[in-house]
């Protein structure tokens, strides 16, 4: 049977499972491009400091050309110290950029599944398939085009300074070095910016490719639903959501109530009664604690009478359901309250 077409976007559950396996949309181009670009900017910013350290390294090496073998230890210490001073800022910058670029792409994730042993990784046939896959072909073509593009841009930027460098022997050494550093900086930063733009395009493509890869068929959606239907966590989440919706609907009915009976703050029952339509008062809302307080608050906002009847409230609460009529045994007590409420309304409007 032919594989069913995957036309549906991945569900949150599928995305979470795929993420746990270490499969996320990412582009290594972004990290490498940012490292190169920011390292260049750091070199420009700390150029004087780095140049001084490089000169010290050079002097340290040349100063010990004719040194005695007993002085080589001191040479090593000086050389190592200066190298560390030069490379430490670049190392920490590169580390920070790599971490932040990956966090920006797919957030924090820790999983050992990509490191787990899989037979297909050592299967030579699978290796050959990966080598001749469309993904490998795309990466090869992309990197080749990227290399040609960057070379073309470098040639274009350097072309303007070509004449100066060819005739540099006629200029002072300081001016030649200054021009060389300036031209190199402009060229490298331009290449870094272009490489970063290419990296963002690569990430957009990888994101599209990832979304396409994790798409689901209708059959997979049905199977996932059946699988999750009995999952305790999902069931509790669904029940909580249903309770929240029921509570919202119930609170929306409170403004339609005729009276609210309370105990006085622990229990609240909102009753609606229309003599022309209802055979008996209907419970539109009920609740304890904070829900009871909310019912009373809404009732007061809509000028609905709130009557304190602790014994009746305690008796009504377990015996009635929202949306149902009260039982006959409460008719007399509730009728007296509603009659009193209606009498007060008539007296107000009289």
Curated annotation (Swiss-Prot):
<keyword id="KW-1133">Transmembrane helix</keyword>
<dbReference type="InterPro" id="IPR006135">
    <property type="entry name" value="T3SS_substrate_exporter"/>
</dbReference>
<keyword id="KW-1005">Bacterial flagellum biogenesis</keyword>
<feature type="transmembrane region" description="Helical">
    <location>
        <begin position="185"/>
        <end position="205"/>
    </location>
</feature>
<keyword id="KW-0813">Transport</keyword>
<feature type="transmembrane region" description="Helical">
    <location>
        <begin position="147"/>
        <end position="167"/>
    </location>
</feature>
<dbReference type="GO" id="GO:0044780">
    <property type="term" value="P:bacterial-type flagellum assembly"/>
</dbReference>
<keyword id="KW-0997">Cell inner membrane</keyword>
<keyword id="KW-0653">Protein transport</keyword>
<dbReference type="Pfam" id="PF01312">
    <property type="entry name" value="Bac_export_2"/>
</dbReference>
<keyword id="KW-0812">Transmembrane</keyword>
<comment type="similarity">
    <text>Belongs to the type III secretion exporter family.</text>
</comment>
<comment type="function">
    <text>Required for formation of the rod structure in the basal body of the flagellar apparatus. Together with FliI and FliH, may constitute the export apparatus of flagellin.</text>
</comment>
<keyword id="KW-1003">Cell membrane</keyword>
<keyword id="KW-0472">Membrane</keyword>
<keyword id="KW-1006">Bacterial flagellum protein export</keyword>
<dbReference type="GO" id="GO:0005886">
    <property type="term" value="C:plasma membrane"/>
</dbReference>
<protein>
    <recommendedName>
        <fullName>Flagellar biosynthetic protein FlhB</fullName>
    </recommendedName>
</protein>
<feature type="transmembrane region" description="Helical">
    <location>
        <begin position="30"/>
        <end position="50"/>
    </location>
</feature>
<dbReference type="GO" id="GO:0009306">
    <property type="term" value="P:protein secretion"/>
</dbReference>
<dbReference type="InterPro" id="IPR006136">
    <property type="entry name" value="FlhB"/>
</dbReference>
<dbReference type="InterPro" id="IPR029025">
    <property type="entry name" value="T3SS_substrate_exporter_C"/>
</dbReference>
<feature type="transmembrane region" description="Helical">
    <location>
        <begin position="90"/>
        <end position="110"/>
    </location>
</feature>
């Amino acid at each position: 049977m032919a594989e069913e077409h995957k036309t549906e976007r991945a569900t949150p559950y599928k995305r979470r499972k795929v993420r746990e396996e270490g499969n996320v949309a990412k582009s290594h181009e972004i990290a490498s491009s940012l490292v190169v670009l920011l390292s260049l900017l750091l070199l420009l910013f700390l150029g004087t400091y780095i140049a001084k350290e490089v000169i010290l390294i050079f002097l340290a090496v040349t100063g010990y050309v004719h040194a005695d073998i007993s002085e080589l230890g001191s040479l090593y210490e000086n050389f190592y110290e200066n190298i560390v001073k030069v490379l430490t800022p670049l190392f920490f910058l590169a580390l920070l950029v790599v971490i932040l670029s990956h966090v920006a792409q797919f957030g924090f994730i820790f999983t050992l599944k990509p490191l787990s042993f899989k037979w297909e990784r050592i299967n030579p046939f699978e290796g050959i398939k990966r080598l001749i896959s469309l993904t490998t072909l795309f990466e090869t073509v992309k990197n080749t085009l990227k290399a040609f593009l960057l070379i073309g841009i470098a040639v274009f930027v350097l072309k303007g300074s070509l004449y100066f460098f060819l005739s540099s022997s006629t200029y002072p050494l300081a001016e030649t070095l200054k021009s060389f550093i300036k031209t190199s900086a402009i060229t490298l930063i331009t290449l870094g910016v272009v490489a970063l733009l290419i990296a963002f395009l690569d990430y957009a493509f990888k994101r599209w490719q990832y979304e396409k890869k994790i798409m689901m068929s209708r059959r997979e959606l049905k199977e996932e639903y059946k699988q999750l239907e009995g999952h305790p966590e999902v069931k509790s989440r669904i029940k909580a959501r249903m309770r929240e919706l029921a509570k919202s609907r119930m609170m929306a009915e409170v403004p339609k109530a005729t009276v609210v009976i309370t105990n006085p703050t622990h229990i609240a029952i909102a009753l609606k009664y229309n003599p022309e339509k209802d055979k008996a008062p209907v419970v539109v809302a009920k609740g304890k604690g904070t829900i009871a307080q909310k019912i009373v608050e809404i009732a007061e906002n809509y000028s609905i009478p709130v009557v304190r009847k602790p014994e009746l409230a305690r008796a009504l609460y377990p015996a009635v359901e929202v949306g149902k009529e009260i039982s006959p045994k409460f008719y007399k007590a509730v009728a007296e309250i509603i009659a009193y409420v209606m009498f007060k309304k008539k007296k107000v409007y009289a």
